[in-house]
Curated annotation (Swiss-Prot):
One of its GO terms (cellular component) is cytosolic large ribosomal subunit. It comes from Brugia pahangi. The lineage of its organism: Eukaryota, Metazoa, Ecdysozoa, Nematoda, Chromadorea. InterPro entries: Rbsml_eL15_core_dom_sf, Ribosomal_eL15, Ribosomal_eL15_CS, Ribosomal_uL23/eL15/eS24_sf. GO terms for molecular function: RNA binding; structural constituent of ribosome. Keywords: Ribonucleoprotein, Ribosomal protein. Belongs to the eukaryotic ribosomal protein eL15 family. PROSITE patterns: RIBOSOMAL_L15E (PS01194). This is Large ribosomal subunit protein eL15.
């Protein structure tokens, strides 16, 4: 199984120990960042490639915190 296939399987099984650990660590890291943060590469490279992402100049990726709840 290739690396992209392995990552894809991890995202499908969100309740696995590995995925729970990754999400917990990332959640903590994201809370330490500013509301709008420029990232060097996508969090899910296999999905980004499927959606047309290329690691060329001109592609800029930001992670933006969105408030949840309320009306």
């Amino acid at each position: 199984m290739g690396a992209y296939r392995y990552m894809q399987e991890l995202w499908r099984k969100k309740k696995s120990e590995t995925m729970r650990y990754l999400l917990r660590i990332r959640c903590w890291q994201y809370r330490q960042l500013t509301a709008i943060h420029r990232v060097s590469r996508p969090t899910r490279p296999e999905k980004a490639r499927r959606l047309g992402y290329l690691s060329n100049e001109g592609y800029i990726i930001y992670r933006v915190r969105v408030l949840r709840g309320g009306r």
